[in-house]
Amino acid sequence: MTSDSAIPNLGSNSAFSDAESNSTVVNPKSNSTSPDAESNSVIPDAELNSVLQYLKLNAEVTNVESDAPMVDEQVNSAPAHINLPDLDLDLEPISPATDVNSNSGWLSLNSPESVVDNKVKNNIQVQLKTEAGRLLVVLPTELQVPATEFTWSDIWQQLKFRLNAGDRLRTRNTTVHLVAYDRLLDGRQLQQLAETFSEVQLQLKSVATSRRQTAIAAVTSGYSVEQLQPETILSSEPKATSTPQADALYLEMTIRSGVEIRHPGTVILLGDINPGGIVVADGDILVWGRLRGIAHAGAGGNRDCLIMSLQMEPTQLRIADAVARAPEKSPTHFFPEVAHITSQGIRIVRSTDFSRNQISKINQTP
């Protein structure tokens, strides 16, 4: 026998009708009271109590949330309300503009926190050089940056980015010589490198290292090994400033906001540099596209370096220690232009005029 207290008033605006709005399935048209019936119209006491308890808890949570400070709401909306500091175009070194909505953590070759000294950081990266028909992949030494600050994940992601950015001059099936110096690598890491090279039709053939463990791992994996002496690495450090620039870096991509490219040589970009994007090079910077971000050529102090672009709309230009800001009014017509240093500072001229000027200077030279 079912008492009246066990049957809720389905026609009233009781708390159970609120439960129905919370996806609890009830058939209000059935009036059957048989416990063996297949209808769900009679709700057991336990289930009814659980629903009422659920509604009670929800009501308490709602009251707490309405009385508490809007902490969660402020946290979730923080990216939309963060007031990023304006980019000070006169500060040293260049401060990259950060886009909180960008995915800057594989593509970020150098994060904003790592920008401490331009001249030092230019060489603290994986370098690619061509020599005698083979590709040299040079890892930074632990003397330059400890393994705790430049981890294997950083090395691997940076190398993948450099390879996948696209080098039009790269020949397929080119052999790769890995110069690991004093970096400690195991067999698993060497295998990851070999697979990464294989994805872009390159073949890892040899490893140069001063670490015995790395040499053993390389031999075990079937690679030729060139044993380096630690003294050689130490003695070569003071001569680092006299070494020639690295090979030109060719990229096919768009440098988006929050992305920074640094290279100890010339950078040739087939694509755009968006506002907030940064390219820093010890050599020239050639942009076969729109330059709307920051470009710093001659970062090592070479005032003869140039910045060239098909469409020059920079946020900031730097050549060596000279800085130029963008004009307040954007030009209405665009031409291929060249930025270079004069006695009055950085000057931007049409590429045709620059060529004529250069020819005139050459002709005037005794």
Curated annotation (Swiss-Prot):
Similarity remark: In the C-terminal section; belongs to the MinC family.
Region (Disordered) location: 1-42
Keyword annotations of the record: Cell cycle, Cell division, Septation
Region annotated Unknown, chain positions: 1-59
Primary gene name: minC
Transmembrane segments: none
Gene Ontology BP term (one): division septum assembly
NCBIfam families in the record: PRK00513.2-4
Function of the protein: Cell division inhibitor that blocks the formation of polar Z ring septums. Rapidly oscillates between the poles of the cell to destabilize FtsZ filaments that have formed before they mature into polar Z rings. Prevents FtsZ polymerization.
Protein name according to UniProt: Probable septum site-determining protein MinC
Taxonomic source organism: Nostoc sp. (strain PCC 7120 / SAG 25.82 / UTEX 2576)
One Pfam family, short name: MinC_C
PANTHER family recorded: SEPTUM SITE-DETERMINING PROTEIN MINC
Lineage: Bacteria, Bacillati, Cyanobacteriota, Cyanophyceae, Nostocales
